[in-house]
Amino acid sequence: MKHPIITLTSDFGVQSQGIGIMEGVALEINPEAHVIHLMHGLPDFNLFYAARTMETVSYMPVGYHVCVVDPGVGTKRKPIIIETGRGDFLIGPDNGVLIPATRFLGGIKKVVEITNEKYMKKPISPIFHGRDIFTPAAAYLSKGVKIGEFGKELKPEELAKAPYEEAITEEDKIHAKIISINKFGSLHLNITHSAWDKCGAELN
């Protein structure tokens, strides 16, 4: 891809200089990349909202998608890369926030823990992994570095669980959760199109 797509999502708030810093880090590594700021106004540390937002990268071109909603930053939680069946790479903390998106991107193909400091920005801050670990990983991947170069492979079942599961279908019923409510009052549920179709209902 001549101009690979890197998306950035965080709970930093639009006033944060961290947003521009992450874009700068990405472009320093790969000046040919095109950076899309998907969302930076997520509620602080809210994994539900963040996971729901990451689902929408399915509307983006195949690319490298970073999520920095990370209440466990500074702890032993793992930084990870998930390669999906569609060909996207999801980069962020192992706190479940990336898992729901994989259901819309062809499932999980491969997972690695990011441990190779060759592909990190130094000095590595214990509290700004978005700048020093996640964004550099996305940028190096977009330049063609193979996922296996970043660290050891993990099994999908080793990963932290998603903040919510898929809705449960039962004949003509769906048991769902409200994931978020936008400012217009629209509800976002954990219902996929295929689950909705099974119930024979119309979806707007």
Regions found by a protein language model. Give the residues of each.
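Anionic-ligand-binding alpha/beta catalytic cores of soluble enzymes and soluble regulatory domains
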Residues: 121-191, 195, 200
